[in-house]
Amino acid sequence: MATIGRDTTISWLGHGTFHIQTPGGKKILIDAWVDGNPVCPDEWKQRVRSEGLDAIFLTHGHFDHIADILDLATATNATIVGQFDITSWLASKGVGQDRLVGFNKGGTVEVAGIRATMTHATHSSTFTDNGIIVPMGTEAGYVLRMENGFVMYHTGDTAVTMDMQIIGDLYRPELVFLPIGDHFTMDPMQAAYALKLIRPKFAIPEHYGTFPILRGTPDQLREQCSAFGVDVTVIDLKPGESVS
């Protein structure tokens, strides 16, 4: 497996959830689907609680990205970062305002030593709360700048958009997390074109293989990158695996 070499450890917990240990030793989670996640290893279900979290970044409101957020908010005392609509809902559920950082696309905040800029994605964002469909604002991604200057971009659940070229031009991310599963998000061909626009050194595919309907594979992504002439190292993690 390739190494990143940026004093950052990235662990895939399956589907769209990632655990990141930053160069400064902070522990962050991107999206919060752990307990009900059928591919998240039991070890990680325990570790995110026992080791604690400094911050949780939420991309949107679908159950497979926030189902465990209230439990993890209680268990870890993490600062929760997301679109203002999501953090307002969390406040209504009893999460303290001092632990919520709500903002919107184009905005930048600093949490746990990380400078995070919220970016555009194209998807949808609702949550079913006690049988009621609750709007959760709009879907988003994040550009994350680590303490040592390492830049990562998590696209969120999305189709390919030309905005990705702007993100590549402005922030020059070295590593991109992006979905490849098809049906609800990009397929491998669209994801490869997204990488052509962004031009990172590394790509970590996600949001595939959780259910049979999410058919895209990392090998298909590599094939499409080759077809588009994209020079990128695709890091193919299995749920529970890490790369540094």
From Swiss-Prot:
PANTHER family (alphabetical): UPF0173 METAL-DEPENDENT HYDROLASE MJ1163 (PTHR43546:SF3), UPF0173 METAL-DEPENDENT HYDROLASE MJ1163-RELATED (PTHR43546)
What protein name applies here?
Answer: UPF0173 metal-dependent hydrolase Rcas_3617
Q: Which GO terms describe its molecular function?
A: hydrolase activity
Record-linked Pfam families: Lactamase_B_2 (PF12706)
Q: Which UniProt keywords apply?
A: Hydrolase
| UniProt source species | Roseiflexus castenholzii (strain DSM 13941 / HLO8)
Instruction: Give a yes or no for keyword Hydrolase in this entry.
Output: yes
Question: Hydrolase among the record's keywords?
Answer: yes
**Annotated family:** Belongs to the UPF0173 family.
